[in-house]
Curated annotation (Swiss-Prot):
Transmembrane segments: none annotated. It comes from Arthroderma benhamiae (strain ATCC MYA-4681 / CBS 112371). Residues 1-20 form the signal peptide. The lineage of its organism: Eukaryota, Fungi, Dikarya, Ascomycota, Pezizomycotina. GO terms for cellular component: extracellular region. SMART domains: LysM. It catalyses: peptidoglycan-N-acetyl-D-glucosamine + H2O = peptidoglycan-D-glucosamine + acetate. It comes from the Eukaryota. The active site is at residues 156, 308. The record marks 278 as: Raises pKa of active site His. Keywords: Carbohydrate metabolism, Cobalt, Glycoprotein, Hydrolase, Metal-binding, Secreted, Signal, Zinc. This is Probable peptidoglycan-N-acetylglucosamine deacetylase ARB_03699. GO terms for biological process: carbohydrate metabolic process. The keyword Chloroplast does not apply. Its EC number is 3.5.1.104.
C-alpha cells in the first residue's frame, strides 16, 4: 500500500512538472514511458497534453493561411512589396480558399501603391504611338538648333568621291553629319549606294536636296512634287525602304508654293545660320577663311552650318578644323534631327509621301520689279527673268571671277543663275549669266 501511494505521488509530481514546462530535458520522456501503467493516473495521462501541444505547430505549418498572413503584415509596408506579390500569386500552389483569402488581404494592403502604378502604366501604353510624334514643324524654314550645346554641320550636293572619307572623319571624332543629297548632281547616287547605306546605318542623317538640284521656285506644284518623290524612290532602294522627312531647298530659293508643297508633303525645311562658303574658298589657302566664317557664326549664336562634301579641300582640310572648334567650345556635333530634339524615328518615313489632290500644274508667274534686259547670248533654264545686266562666259572664267568683276556676291550669282550650281560646275562657255537685277 505504501509503495502504491508513493508511486501515485511520484506520478502526480511528474505530471505537474510536465504541465508547467520541462525543468530538465529528460522529463517529457519520463512521463511518456510505457512502464508507468495508465491506471496509476487518476486523471488523463500527462503525455496526451504534451502530444497536443507538440502537434499544434505541425498543424499550423500545413495551414498556409497562418504563415501567409504573417508575411502580409511585413510586406504591407509601402516600400517593398511591388515585385513579390505578382510572383507569389502566380504560383500554382496558392489554390486553397485560405490562400486565396490571404492573397486578397495582401493585395488590398498594397492597393494604394499598385493601383496607381497600374493605371499609370496602362494609360501610358495606351497613349503611346507606334512612332514618336514630331514637334518640328513642316513647311517652315528652320535655320538654327533648339537643343542647347549642339551644332549641326551639314553637307549639300553629294554624294561624291569624298563623302566616304567625310564619314571616316566624323566617325573618328564621335560626331554625326547630315547629308542633303541629290540623286543626280556631281554624280549618280546609285554609284555611291554603299556610302549612303553606311551613313544611314551608322547614325548620320540622310536628307533630301531634290532629285537633281532644281530651282524649286521656278517649278509648278507637280514639278516640285516630282523633284521630291523621285529622289525618295531612289533613296528607298538604297536604305531598305526609308525615305527622308528633312529637306533643304537648293539655292535657298523659296516661294510660297514651295513651302506650301513641303508642308503638304510633310517635309521639314532646313536652311542654315552659318555659311562656311567653302565653295568660294576651295583651295588650301582658303580653308582658314572658311574656318573664320564658322567661328564668327558660332560667336553670333549660330548652330546649323553649311558646307559641301563635293569639294576635296573641304573634306581633306576643313572638316577636322571645324570639329576641333566644336570640341574646343564644349559643344557637340550632331545631326539636324538631334539638334532639334527630334527622335531618329522621325527622320524617315517608310511609305511614299501622300501627294495632295488638286496640285497645281501651272508654272508660277514671275513678278519682276522691272522688265529684264534681253540677254546677249543663250541662257540656261531658271535664269532671273528681271535681269538687267549680263555676262557672256568666255574661256577661263570662274564664278568667283565673274562675281568679283561685277561687284556681286557669289550667293546672288547662284541665285540669279540656279542652273550653274553652287559649285559652278555648269558654267557653260558662250552662255550669258545674269550679274545684276
Amino acid at each position: 500500500m505504501l509503495m502504491r501511494l508513493y508511486t501515485f505521488f511520484a506520478a502526480a509530481l511528474l505530471a505537474c512538472c510536465a504541465a508547467a514546462g520541462p525543468l530538465h530535458p529528460e522529463l517529457p520522456q519520463l512521463v511518456g514511458k510505457s512502464w508507468i501503467p495508465d491506471w496509476w493516473f487518476p486523471f488523463p495521462r500527462p503525455s496526451t497534453r504534451a502530444a497536443t501541444t507538440t502537434t499544434t505547430p505541425a498543424t499550423s505549418t500545413t495551414g498556409l493561411a497562418t504563415t501567409t498572413t504573417k508575411p502580409t503584415t511585413t510586406s504591407s509596408k509601402p516600400v517593398t512589396p511591388t515585385p513579390q506579390p505578382a510572383t507569389s500569386t502566380a504560383q500554382p500552389a496558392i489554390s486553397s480558399t485560405a490562400n486565396a483569402t490571404a492573397t486578397a488581404t495582401a493585395s488590398s494592403a498594397s492597393t494604394s501603391t499598385t493601383s496607381s502604378s497600374t493605371s499609370a502604366s496602362t494609360s501610358t501604353s495606351a497613349a503611346a504611338p507606334s512612332t514618336p510624334t514630331t514637334v518640328v514643324p513642316f513647311g517652315q524654314v528652320i535655320r538654327s538648333c533648339t537643343v542647347k550645346g549642339t551644332v549641326a554641320i551639314t553637307f549639300d550636293d553629294g554624294p561624291y568621291d569624298y563623302t566616304n572619307k567625310l564619314l571616316d572623319i566624323f566617325d573618328a571624332n564621335g560626331a554625326k553629319a547630315t547629308l542633303f543629297v541629290n540623286a543626280q548632281n556631281f554624280g549618280s547616287i546609285t554609284d555611291y549606294s554603299s556610302v549612303m547605306l553606311r551613313a544611314f546605318n551608322t547614325g548620320h542623317q540622310i536628307a533630301s536636296h531634290t532629285y537633281d538640284h532644281a530651282d524649286l521656285s521656278t517649278l509648278n506644284g507637280a514639278g516640285i512634287i516630282s523633284e521630291m518623290t523621285k529622289l525618295d524612290d531612289v533613296l528607298a532602294t538604297i536604305t531598305n525602304g526609308y525615305r527622308p522627312t528633312y529637306m533643304r531647298v537648293p539655292y535657298f530659293a523659296y516661294s510660297p508654293l514651295v513651302l506650301q508643297t513641303m508642308a503638304d508633303l510633310k517635309y521639314h525645311v532646313i536652311e542654315a545660320d552659318i555659311d562656311t562658303k567653302d565653295y568660294e574658298h576651295d583651295t588650301p589657302d582658303g580653308v582658314s577663311v572658311s574656318v573664320g566664317f564658322f567661328r564668327d557664326g558660332l560667336n553670333a549664336g549660330g548652330s546649323i552650318a553649311l558646307a559641301h562634301d563635293v569639294h576635296q579641300t573641304t573634306v581633306d582640310l576643313l572638316i577636322q578644323q571645324l570639329l576641333d572648334e566644336v570640341k574646343r567650345r564644349g559643344l557637340k556635333a550632331v545631326t539636324v534631327g538631334e539638334c532639334l530634339g527630334d527622335p531618329r524615328a522621325n527622320w524617315y518615313r517608310t511609305t511614299p509621301v501622300q501627294v495632295p489632290t488638286g496640285t497645281s500644274t501651272t508654272s508660277p508667274t514671275a513678278t519682276p520689279t522691272s522688265p529684264g534686259t534681253p540677254p546677249p547670248a543663250p541662257t540656261q533654264p531658271g535664269v532671273a527673268s528681271n535681269c538687267q545686266k549680263w555676262h557672256t562666259v568666255v574661256s577661263g572664267d570662274t564664278c568667283y571671277d565673274i562675281a568679283a568683276a561685277n561687284g556681286i556676291s557669289l550667293d546672288n550669282l547662284y541665285k540669279w543663275n540656279p542652273a550653274v550650281g553652287t559649285s559652278c560646275a555648269s558654267l557653260w562657255l558662250g552662255y550669258a549669266v545674269c550679274v545684276g537685277v
